A protein has these predicted regions:
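Positively charged n-region of N-terminal signal peptides that target proteins for export
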Residues: 1-4, 200-204
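Sec-dependent signal peptide recognition
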Residues: 2-8, 187-191
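Bacterial N-terminal signal peptides
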Residues: 7-15
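Prokaryotic Sec-type signal peptides and long signal-anchor helices
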Residues: 16, 146-148, 203
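Sec/Tat signal peptide C-region and signal peptidase I cleavage site
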Residues: 17-21
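Mature extracellular "passenger" or substrate-interacting domains of secreted, surface-exposed proteins
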Residues: 22-182
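A short, hydrophobic C-terminal helix/tail in secreted or cell-surface proteins
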Residues: 184-201
Length: 204
C-alpha cells in the first residue's frame, strides 16, 4: 500500500515547529519485531533543556506499515532515560491523540521495564479498543516533561541508546494479531530530509 501523502506532509509540517538541531530519527520494522508481521514505524525525537533539572522531549511517531493486508494500529511506545540520575522521569503533558496516556514506569514485555512512555489506556499490553491508536499512514506528536539532575547533559539520543531503549506496540492487525518492535540503531539528520525520507523509502 502506498503511504498516504497526508501522513508525510503532516510530519513535515509538525517538524517545522522544532527549533533544536538535536533531532534523532528512528524506525522499526520486520527486522526488529517479535512476531515479524510486517508492521513498521518511523519517529523523530527532539530534546530541549529548559533550565534547572528540567527538559522537554517531543516525539513524533508514525505508523508506516506498508501492506494494506497487514493493517493494525500503533497503540503505544515506551523508552528509557539514559541518565546518571536513577530517579530521572518523563511525564506525558500533551499529545495530538488524546487516547494515549502517560504510562510512567511500564513493563513492556518481552523487552523488560521502561522508564516512561505513552499508550492507549496507559497500558502497553492492553488499553482498550486498538482502533483508537494510530492507523496505517497516521502520525501523532507527544510532548514529555523530563526531570533529571543531569537534564542539561541529556540529548535526544539519551532516550534511544542503540535502539534497545525505545519500543513500540501494535495491536488490532487485520488477522487479529499484534506485534512489538524495538528501534534499531538510530541516525541523525536535518529535519526536512528526515521528514521526506522516512516516508518516501516505504512507498510501494
Amino acid at each position: 500500500m502506498k503511504t498516504t501523502l497526508t501522513c508525510g506532509l503532516t510530519l513535515i509540517g509538525l517538524s517545522a515547529g522544532i527549533s533544536s538541531a538535536d533531532i534523532m530519527s528512528i524506525s522499526g520494522g520486520i527486522d526488529t519485531s517479535i512476531e515479524q508481521t510486517g508492521v513498521s514505524f518511523d519517529a523523530m525525537l527532539d530534546y530541549n533543556y529548559t533550565g534547572g533539572t528540567n527538559g522537554t522531549l517531543t516525539i513524533e511517531i508514525a505508523n508506516t506499515t506498508a501492506e494494506a493486508a497487514i493493517g493494525g494500529y500503533l497503540t503505544g511506545f515506551v523508552f528509557n532515560i539514559l541518565s546518571s540520575d536513577a530517579a530521572a522521569s518523563a511525564v506525558l503533558i500533551s499529545g495530538t491523540n488524546t487516547s494515549f496516556l502517560n504510562t510512567g514506569i511500564e513493563n513492556a514485555a518481552p523487552f523488560g521495564t521502561f522508564d516512561a512512555g505513552a499508550a492507549l489506556g496507559a497500558n502497553w499490553t492492553g488499553g482498550g479498543n486498538p482502533n483508537s491508536g494510530l492507523g496505517v499512514g497516521n502520525s501523532g506528536t507527544f510532548e514529555f516533561s523530563v526531570s533529571a539532575l543531569d537534564a542539561d547533559l541529556l540529548s535526544s539520543s539519551s532516550f534511544v541508546g542503540a535502539g534497545e531503549h525505545f519500543a513500540v506496540r501494535f495491536r488490532g492487525l487485520d488477522d487479529g494479531g499484534s506485534d512489538k518492535l524495538l528501534a534499531p540503531a538510530p541516525g541523525t539528520g536535518a529535519v526536512a530530509l528526515i521528514g521526506l525520507g522516512i516516508f518516501s523509502r516505504r512507498r510501494r
